[in-house]
């Protein structure tokens, strides 16, 4: 049995199938872990969702910000943006089944010594705390009507964790930290304006995994979301978003002692022009 973590697919279904051929994926004995953002911006969101859902227990995924955006559009809270490419999902005959499956995916997934999350774990939390906080959001998403949550999840505040946070502010921080975070200041305050590669940000900001006095996560964090960072192997974290959508690669990491990396190039040189507005 082999376990592979795979970076942001974002509807790049053809590349996903090529990657699975490369690693010789066998759903009868292997397992896939996806870092979220299964949909949007790429050409085949519907095929991607159907395929991954159809893998059953052979696959697990966490929710990414694009997945949440799809849910918000589907329930009428948000509008389709000009770069969105998930109209095929919204018009599909099995739309309701796919969306019901998607909204019951976790924000954090633990697999042995690995912790899978879309954007990262904020500096004030370890993996166990992240699982508990994620559970608060997951309970709301699984409860039925998610209109209220989708309406309230947008916004950049609060940007600093406190155990005293309550209500929508608390849920918004949890969601933002786990699905949108890249940079923090040295106190752990989240910054959502800077989206480029490390080295281009203001001196007051550092990647979330480099914040001084960051709480040890107690697990190896596997994340995506940050395509301008690309493949990154830190002391206790790995970034697997290698920008397939923008003409880069789709990456898989074998979660064993070797941590062998596999990648396939984007087809057609990418599906959209690179942007820092992901």
Curated annotation (Swiss-Prot):
It comes from the Bacteria. Transmembrane segments: none annotated. Pfam families: Metallophos. Signal peptide: none annotated. InterPro entries: ApaH (IPR004617), Calcineurin-like_PHP_ApaH (IPR004843), Metallo-depent_PP-like (IPR029052). The keyword Hydrolase applies. Hydrolyzes diadenosine 5',5'''-P1,P4-tetraphosphate to yield ADP. Its EC number is 3.6.1.41. This is Bis(5'-nucleosyl)-tetraphosphatase, symmetrical. SUPFAM superfamilies: Metallo-dependent phosphatases (SSF56300). It comes from Methylococcus capsulatus (strain ATCC 33009 / NCIMB 11132 / Bath). Belongs to the Ap4A hydrolase family.
């Amino acid at each position: 049995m082999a376990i592979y973590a795979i970076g942001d697919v974002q509807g790049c279904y053809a590349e996903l199938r090529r990657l699975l051929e490369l690693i010789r994926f066998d759903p009868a004995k292997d397992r896939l872990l996806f870092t979220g953002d299964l949909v949007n911006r790429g050409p085949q969101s519907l095929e991607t969702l159907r395929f991954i859902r159809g893998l059953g227990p052979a696959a697990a995924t966490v929710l990414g910000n694009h997945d949440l955006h799809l849910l918000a559009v589907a329930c009428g809270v948000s509008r389709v943006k000009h770069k969105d490419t998930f109209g095929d999902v919204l018009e599909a005959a099995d739309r309701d089944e796919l969306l019901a499956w998607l909204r019951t995916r976790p924000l954090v997934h633990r697999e042995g010594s690995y912790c899978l999350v879309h954007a990262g774990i904020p500096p004030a939390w370890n993996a166990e705390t992240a699982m508990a906080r994620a559970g608060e959001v997951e309970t709301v998403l699984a409860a039925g009507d998610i209109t209220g949550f989708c309406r309230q999840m947008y916004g950049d505040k609060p940007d600093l964790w406190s155990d005293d946070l309550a209500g929508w502010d608390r849920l918004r921080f949890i969601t933002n930290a786990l699905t949108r975070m890249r940079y923090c200041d040295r106190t752990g305050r989240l910054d959502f304006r800077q989206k480029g590669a490390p080295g281009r940000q203001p001196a007051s900001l550092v990647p979330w995994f480099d914040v001084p006095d960051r709480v040890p996560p107690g697990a190896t964090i596997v994340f995506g979301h940050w395509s301008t960072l690309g493949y990154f192997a830190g002391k206790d974290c790995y970034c697997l978003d290698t920008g397939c959508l923008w003409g880069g690669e789709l990456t898989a990491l074998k979660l064993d002692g070797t941590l062998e990396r596999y990648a396939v190039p984007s087809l057609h040189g990418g599906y959209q022009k690179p942007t820092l507005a992901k």
